[in-house]
Amino acid sequence: MSMQDPIADMLTRIRNGQAANKVAVTMPSSKLKVAIANLLKEEGFIEDFKIEGDTKPVLELVLKYFQGKAVVESIQRISRPGLRIYKKKDALPKVMAGLGIAVISTSKGVMTDRAARQAGLGGEIICYVA
């Protein structure tokens, strides 16, 4: 059976992995998942990520903890296959008054809400991370 929402699966694996104090989580890889993982690493929400395998690539995320607590407090899917959420550049949300990030898929690639505002781009709101 095929997976309906691979991005929601990725976010759930991160949430469950940190709840269980796992060092790393693995999942099937895709270009969008790698772009999201790269953003999470740049923003300091995960330690690192790597892609393994050629025929069926697997994405491994190394989770980050601070003083025994997970760095990611909440991770929430916003736009989903059944209900896509798009926002214009002036309507992009601020997550936790700027402490968290919104991952936005724009015409120039996947970026944070801050970067999209600076570039003057709107797009699909993939998820919130705080």
From Swiss-Prot:
Look up the domain of life of the source: Bacteria
The record lists its disulfide bonds as none
Any GO BP annotation? translation
Q: Which PANTHER family would you find in this protein's record? A: 40S RIBOSOMAL PROTEIN S15A (PTHR11758)
| The protein's role, per its UniProt record | One of the primary rRNA binding proteins, it binds directly to 16S rRNA central domain where it helps coordinate assembly of the platform of the 30S subunit.
Cite the record's note on assembly.
Answer: Part of the 30S ribosomal subunit. Contacts proteins S5 and S12.
Q: What is this protein called?
A: Small ribosomal subunit protein uS8
Native source species: Serratia proteamaculans (strain 568)
